[in-house]
Amino acid sequence: LPSGRGFRIETSDGVVTADHVVAATGPFQTPVIPPVVPDGVINQIHSCHYRNPEQLEDGGVLVVGAGSSGSQIADELLRSGRDVWLSVGPHDRPPRSYRGKDFVWWLGVLGKWQMKTPPAGREHVTIAVSGAYGGKTVDFRRFADRGMTLLGMTQGFEDGVISVAGDLAQNVAEGDANHLGLLAEADAYVEANGLDLPLEEEAKIIGPDPDCIVNPLCRLDLAEAGITNIIWATGYRQT
């Protein structure tokens, strides 16, 4: 402000003044859609613009990206009765809760918040965790058991056909390893600190691979599959 004290902020809902401003914009600023499928070929939106199944065209949905946004959107679409394909890349898959404690609590006591930022050039994988429906651990095998088709990473597009990487089984297995690794760290912490927390052995059960993992698709013909929408849950870049 001209007085030198306070700030004048222009917002989408008008102008406000304040003595202090906290800039908590985080890294989620500019949505990123990879230049894979040309505009106009099919209805495409970024996950930041997704609100509910009713806003989409009738028909099946391909969700690209299986982090927290992609996995929760795919789950909601499946619950709504849509045919859903989910393109799964490398990811971490922490438990939503374990032994009566939320995963955020575990990340704190296990020192995960103090881990150093990965150096430039090292792959940073997404985290698949859900707060929907009371908060549940994301399990891609269970998605498939309910009728969702899992795919590897989306690689390209030509003549109406999506090309798919052959990395689905590896990505799911590495997510499982991350899940079990965090449970093991949590168990060790409980024992070392003499905590009285309930056992939760069922959290360590990994189900059998569904057919879409055993016999993964390497191509997906959108028209043949009845897919009329693509949701890109592919993250953001900082601006």
Feature locations, PLM:
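Flavin (primarily FAD) cofactor-binding/catalytic cores of flavoenzymes
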Residues: 1-239
